[in-house]
């Protein structure tokens, strides 16, 4: 399932290349997050805490543009 990407005004992004880049970035992010969760669980860290820390980190991030 592909995400319907929107701009700040809520208009759908229609550029195929932009959508492709965003979808690829999300796939890469999912893979990295899965690695973090798997590594943490294998080392005995609570899965819920890992997810909470990832969300905290995300909440601190803003666009550099």
State what each model feature region is.
Residues 1-34, 60-64:
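N-terminal acidic leader/helix
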């Amino acid at each position: 399932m592909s995400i319907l990407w929107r701009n700040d005004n809520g208009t759908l992004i229609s550029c195929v290349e932009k959508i492709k880049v965003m979808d690829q970035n999300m796939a890469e992010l999912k893979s990295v997050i899965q690695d973090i969760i798997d590594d943490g669980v294998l080392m005995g860290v609570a899965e819920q805490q890992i997810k909470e820390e990832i969300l905290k980190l995300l909440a601190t991030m803003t666009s550099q543009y």
